[in-house]
Amino acid sequence: MNIKPKPILYYIYDPMCSWCWGYRPTWLLLQKNIESLVQINTMVGGLAEDSNVPMPETTQHFLQQTWHKISAELGTQFNFDFWSQCQPKRSTYPSCRAVIIARQHQKEQAMCLAIQEAYYLHAQNPSEVSTLIKLAEDIGLDGGLFAQQINSEKLKQQLTNEIIKVRSLPIQGFPSLVLAVDGELFPIRLDYKNWQTSYDMILATLNSVANK
């Protein structure tokens, strides 16, 4: 008798994606309620490549407006001091590599939360490797080893491979959910305010596949 592999729910995000920060409370509830039915695999999508170039004023303005929009719609907390106290850069690949390192130590969620809180609540810049090293130490990782790994060619290739896989999935942005069942991929509707919406769609999809 062949035992079918457990369905996989992919959660695709970027630790510096403001909508992912807004979705976090709902995602935690969905995880809690769905983890007995599916295997949860997290993947980083990489919003912005490595760059030391200061973020253009127009992009800064757009992102601040996005923060205001998310705060108004979802009640998400943001500390706007970031925009006056830090030099913003449009660069999220370093933070994506940071969570890949943490994943290897079963600390991906802790690192993601540390990056999000640093960025959105404490006006710290996760585009800076020095910030990421401090956060790594805060969650119990070896700061020296982390510093060696964060910009290594091996880790950069790991991120590239992950981004290639993410781009092959049926998604249109971050955060996104995709259910993999019996070799088929199903995009799952993501509701920022209610975990039950995605949960019901996952159950319906699983039942539909089972009854084929």
Go through the PLM ranges and name each one.
Residues K4, Y93, I171-Q172:
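A generic fold-level signal
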Residues Y11-I12, M16, Y23-K32, E117-K212:
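C-terminal cap of thioredoxin/glutaredoxin-like
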Residues W21-H122:
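Structural alpha/beta surface segment adjacent to cysteine/selenocysteine redox centers
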Residues K4-Y10:
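Extreme N-terminal starter segment of soluble prokaryotic enzymes
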